């Protein structure tokens, strides 16, 4: 049994990384999106996939978007540990998005609309009547509005009325107007549960959908379902960053990066769309996004003068029209808006994604916060094509060997997946592949290769082994060695028991005391200032510190109209201690009791537990 366990431990690191899968398009198309009443009445006459009218969207007086989080009462109770992880990840993601996107802010309070098709049985359609296009009779069974299974509080909703007489101006009020949500431009309902979608695919960490849009087409509200099991997974201390990345990905979807919203994107001026519409199919059959800022970002990234270089959309799981809400993985691997997210340290909030959000017409983007994508940089307009990817290159590989992920933070294996159309790339190994995590230096694992794990270690293709190693042949694979920058694209490396050595980019070197070679990657190390992994000592700044005052993560006002329905999380007189803590305390006291019983026969132990939590300013619960 112990032998089999050892074999299992040895084999475990060689399985490729299991990545998070996004099912946004599947979810969004099942959601009925509610728009302002005038748009609801007209929706039956509009062909959704066409841009029926060109809109000019002024981009002045924009301020950082204020995203409010609402925790619904139907969300299952979480342990203190789970709740803390959830609030930290969601709060940090919201702060990051607020620092990236500015918007024309909602005046006064954000108030959502009711679905006229739910509360109204028929509408007066005679244009000669006083109450033309107003509701004439209510549905008897109308109860509430919902968003992806979450019941929207009446306080968040506008009122609704019926006009029983087509010529009588006085309506009958069905629901009064709610007070609305103050200081908010977008309302996100966060529901944590192990839903059927979560259980069906373990790679699904979360999913979202927008359910309300404003008069300009901008999303105003949506729901994010976070799979309960996601909060229980924790491989390393940086696992927090995985959750933050997932939440940012889903937030970008509900804020506008959605194929369902392409027809709502706004033009900035005359002749803005090079194809007369946002998307079109190129000569190879690839559907691309052809908006002006996206084209410029693509040209810059791939160093191309191609005047019509749109960003390709993912063809896997695309609709019949070829549209997708993700980038094509072969071309934009590592982007925050790829369909499959790898480890958080390898995901980039890239300039092309931010360009797309800019071209929605609803946001001004802080492009200075874009992160280096690296994948395909400078490789030309044909990079990532199926015809070219089957040859080994700086980004693609062939076969199934071991090597390094293209960012050189992780060891990898040459594999393909459902989004790569048969192309192969080096993906991180599932376990202990991170060179920058010191704990991955497992005793006995490739000691002869001179590996060093730590925050300044990176992955190098190598086949070195100590001269006294009995192994006759060492295959080329990824190894972890220390590095330090001496200039742009210039660095030294250090192998175990060696001095620092110059490693000229694009060459290979030998190491004294070892046989074999180390290959020095070109245009990867010491070139991008923002390519630094989280470390074991890194701590996320408190969600409640005023790191970005403009994100306005303020507490809901407690005026007389709102207070009965809003309360901040943890503002309660008693707090429950988590089950894990209780069990731990029980075990400790059981041991203590056993020891004391040697001296006493009877002992009564009473434990009082209490916990304190700082109020979460922007995370809100329904009473």
Curated annotation (Swiss-Prot):
<feature type="binding site">
    <location>
        <position position="253"/>
    </location>
    <ligand>
        <name>Zn(2+)</name>
    </ligand>
</feature>
<dbReference type="GO" id="GO:0061371">
    <property type="term" value="P:determination of heart left/right asymmetry"/>
</dbReference>
<dbReference type="GO" id="GO:0004222">
    <property type="term" value="F:metalloendopeptidase activity"/>
</dbReference>
<feature type="topological domain" description="Extracellular">
    <location>
        <begin position="21"/>
        <end position="578"/>
    </location>
</feature>
<feature type="signal peptide">
    <location>
        <begin position="1"/>
        <end position="20"/>
    </location>
</feature>
<feature type="transmembrane region" description="Helical">
    <location>
        <begin position="579"/>
        <end position="599"/>
    </location>
</feature>
<feature type="binding site">
    <location>
        <position position="326"/>
    </location>
    <ligand>
        <name>Zn(2+)</name>
    </ligand>
</feature>
<keyword id="KW-0862">Zinc</keyword>
<keyword id="KW-0812">Transmembrane</keyword>
<dbReference type="Pfam" id="PF01457">
    <property type="entry name" value="Peptidase_M8"/>
</dbReference>
<keyword id="KW-1133">Transmembrane helix</keyword>
<dbReference type="GO" id="GO:0007155">
    <property type="term" value="P:cell adhesion"/>
</dbReference>
<dbReference type="InterPro" id="IPR001577">
    <property type="entry name" value="Peptidase_M8"/>
</dbReference>
<dbReference type="GO" id="GO:0046872">
    <property type="term" value="F:metal ion binding"/>
</dbReference>
<keyword id="KW-0472">Membrane</keyword>
<feature type="topological domain" description="Cytoplasmic">
    <location>
        <begin position="600"/>
        <end position="623"/>
    </location>
</feature>
<comment type="similarity">
    <text>Belongs to the peptidase M8 family.</text>
</comment>
<comment type="function">
    <text>Plays an essential role for patterning the left-right axis. Requires solely on the left side, downstream of the leftward flow, but upstream of dand5, a nodal inhibitor involved in left-right patterning.</text>
</comment>
<dbReference type="GO" id="GO:0061966">
    <property type="term" value="P:establishment of left/right asymmetry"/>
</dbReference>
<dbReference type="GO" id="GO:0016020">
    <property type="term" value="C:membrane"/>
</dbReference>
<keyword id="KW-0732">Signal</keyword>
<keyword id="KW-0378">Hydrolase</keyword>
<feature type="binding site">
    <location>
        <position position="249"/>
    </location>
    <ligand>
        <name>Zn(2+)</name>
    </ligand>
</feature>
<feature type="active site">
    <location>
        <position position="250"/>
    </location>
</feature>
<keyword id="KW-0482">Metalloprotease</keyword>
<protein>
    <recommendedName>
        <fullName>Ciliated left-right organizer metallopeptidase</fullName>
        <ecNumber>3.4.24.-</ecNumber>
    </recommendedName>
</protein>
<keyword id="KW-0479">Metal-binding</keyword>
<dbReference type="GO" id="GO:0006508">
    <property type="term" value="P:proteolysis"/>
</dbReference>
<keyword id="KW-0645">Protease</keyword>
<keyword id="KW-0217">Developmental protein</keyword>
